[in-house]
């Protein structure tokens, strides 16, 4: 959090420095509060008068983040045709029909992916023995009950092959989902292979794979669509039948040892085609137990997934909020050396932080802030004199494409450049 605040304070501080420079009529302004971000709330609300100062602060901020003392001197710009051709060839950006360059914001996409991964749960469910031979039962964890969007789902099966096998190099393994249906409830148009069982059950082919039968190894069967349908129906139980017609010919066997399988059932399986986990030590067989690997997340509209966002300043609230501010590089005369993007979202935080919202959920992401505020409200030293500040609580990166002094084209990814949310420290 200190690094987060530092980046956020930098832009705010630049504005404060510019604002505090001696100007006619400035003597009447009162001293700034204890923290720079809080001072933003005391600045004049007339945007036209404040804009030039804010633009100067933005310029200083961008140069500082690019480690430049001054803007590059582009005296002889690269011809437009050569520039656009280089961008196309190097894949550092996209050139629109109007000739404008749109930068490939790789870092922004990575940040979105990282945020998405943080919200994704990974669940591994080991198989239990099904009600019949060559069947497996998976009971998805209660953790999965709040998940509705399947990112990936795979069933892992271990194929054991005898060393002497040379008869066949490939075998086909099929996975069928077993479903119970009421009489007449089965849809005739389902895109799957279905076999009626006493009019009460059906089987749907959910995965099929041709595998190498010359070595013992794990094989992965994708079942994302099947699990997605299961979650959409509000179910958590999955019954699978495994079929491998050529396995008996090769002597290969799929280890289908579930955690409810009894020893007498194991012995019976050894006498048949070996698909029930024939041969080998029981402990070793257990290490090859089938499992389901599921990666899933909550949907965008899930009520528990929505977290409170920081307030947007709309002119009607005085408490801590995010102020939108966009600076066009063309308007400030910087489009001659900054190729892309077309401008900078110089958002900043402003507003008051009353004690009743400081450190509360949604206004700050810091547990530390909540604890400090708890003691501050009760007048406990040394926290009694500390004041809560309106600061950035979420920042996002920005990619820039620009010329340096040597007419070289630079693409730089800058972390924590744009304020996304604000809260009270």
Swiss-Prot record:
Sugar-bearing residue positions: 165
Disulfide feature: 313-321, 320-390, 349-422, 353-424
Basic and acidic residues bias: start-end ranges: 263-275
Signal peptide start and end residues: 1-20
SMART domains assigned to the protein according to its UniProt record, in alphabetical order: TGFB
InterPro entries hit by this protein: Cystine-knot_cytokine (IPR029034), Inhibin_betaA (IPR000491), TGF-b_C (IPR001839), TGF-b_propeptide (IPR001111), TGF-beta-rel (IPR015615), TGFb_CS (IPR017948)
Compartment(s) where it occurs, according to its Swiss-Prot or TrEMBL record: Secreted
Propeptide cleavage-removed residue intervals: 21-309
GO CC terms in record: activin A complex; enzyme activator complex; extracellular region; extracellular space; inhibin A complex; perinuclear region of cytoplasm
Region feature Disordered, mapped onto this chain: 259-289
GO MF terms held by the record: cytokine activity; growth factor activity; hormone activity; identical protein binding; peptide hormone binding; type II activin receptor binding
UniProt entry keywords in alphabetical sequence: Cleavage on pair of basic residues, Disulfide bond, Glycoprotein, Growth factor, Hormone, Secreted, Signal
GO biological process: activin receptor signaling pathway; androgen metabolic process; androst-4-ene-3,17-dione biosynthetic process; endodermal cell differentiation; extrinsic apoptotic signaling pathway; eyelid development in camera-type eye; hair follicle development; hematopoietic progenitor cell differentiation
Pfam families: TGF_beta, TGFb_propeptide
Family named by the database record: Belongs to the TGF-beta family.
Function: Inhibins/activins are involved in regulating a number of diverse functions such as hypothalamic and pituitary hormone secretion, gonadal hormone secretion, germ cell development and maturation, erythroid differentiation, insulin secretion, nerve cell survival, embryonic axial development or bone growth, depending on their subunit composition. Activin A is a homodimer of INHBA that plays a role in several essential biological processes including embryonic development, stem cell maintenance and differentiation, haematopoiesis, cell proliferation and tissue fibrosis. Signals through type I (such as ACVR1B or ACVR1C) and type II receptors (such as ACVR2A, ACVR2B or BMPR2) which, upon ligand binding, phosphorylate SMAD2 and SMAD3 intracellular signaling mediators that form a complex with SMAD4, translocate to the nucleus and modulate gene expression.
Assembly and oligomerization: Dimeric, linked by one or more disulfide bonds. Inhibin A is a dimer of alpha/INHA and beta-A/INHBA. Activin A is a homodimer of beta-A/INHBA. Activin AB is a dimer of beta-A/INHBA and beta-B/INHBB. Interacts with FST and FSTL3; these interactions prevent activin A interaction to its type II receptor. Activin A interacts with ACVR2A. Activin A interacts with BMPR2. Inhibin A interacts with ACVR1; this interaction creates a non-signaling complex (NSC) that inhibits ACVR1-mediated BMP signaling. Inhibin A interacts with ACVR2A.
Descriptive protein name: Inhibin beta A chain
Organism (species): Bos taurus (Bovine)
């Amino acid at each position: 959090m200190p690094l987060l605040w530092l980046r956020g304070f930098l832009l705010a501080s630049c504005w404060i420095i510019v604002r505090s420079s001696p100007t006619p009529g400035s003597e009447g302004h009162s001293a700034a509060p204890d923290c720079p971000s809080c001072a933003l709330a005391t600045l004049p609300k007339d945007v036209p008068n404040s804009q030039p100062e804010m633009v100067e602060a933005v310029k200083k901020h961008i140069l500082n983040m690019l480690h430049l003392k001054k803007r590059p001197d582009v005296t002889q710009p690269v011809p437009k045709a050569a520039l656009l051709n280089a961008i196309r060839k190097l894949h550092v950006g996209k050139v629109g029909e109007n000739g404008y360059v749109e930068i490939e914001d790789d870092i922004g996409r990575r940040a979105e992916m990282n945020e998405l991964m943080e919200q994704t749960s990974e669940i591994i469910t080991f198989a239990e023995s099904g009600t019949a031979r060559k069947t497996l039962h998976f009971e998805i964890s209660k953790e999965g009950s709040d998940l509705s969007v399947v990112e990936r789902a795979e069933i892992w099966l271990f194929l054991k092959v005898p060393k002497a096998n040379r008869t066949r190099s490939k075998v086909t393994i099929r996975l069928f989902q077993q479903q119970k249906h009421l009489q007449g409830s089965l849809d005739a148009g389902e895109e799957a292979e279905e076999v009626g069982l006493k009019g009460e059950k059906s089987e749907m082919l959910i995965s099929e794979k041709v595998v190498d039968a010359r070595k013992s190894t794990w094989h992965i069967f994708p079942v994302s669509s099947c699990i997605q349908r299961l979650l959409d129906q509000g179910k958590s139980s999955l019954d699978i039948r495994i079929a491998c017609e050529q396995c008996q010919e090769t002597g290969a066997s799929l280890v289908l040892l579930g955690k409810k399988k009894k020893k007498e059932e194991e012995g019976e399986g050894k006498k048949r085609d070996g698909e029930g986990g024939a041969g080998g030590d029981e402990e070793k067989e257990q290490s090859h137990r089938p499992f389901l690997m599921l990666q899933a997340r909550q949907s965008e509209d899930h009520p528990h997934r929505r977290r409170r966002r920081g307030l947007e300043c709309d002119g009607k609230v005085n408490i801590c909020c995010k102020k939108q501010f966009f600076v066009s590089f063309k308007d400030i005369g910087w489009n001659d050396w900054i190729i892309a993007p077309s401008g900078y979202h110089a958002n900043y935080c402003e507003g008051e932080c009353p004690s009743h919202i400081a450190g509360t959920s949604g206004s700050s992401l810091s547990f530390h802030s909540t604890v400090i505020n708890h003691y501050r409200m009760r007048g406990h030293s040394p926290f009694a004199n500390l004041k809560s500040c309106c600061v950035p609580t979420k920042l996002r990166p920005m990619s820039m494409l620009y010329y340096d002094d040597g007419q070289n084209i630079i693409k730089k990814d800058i972390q924590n450049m744009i304020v996304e949310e604000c809260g009270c420290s």
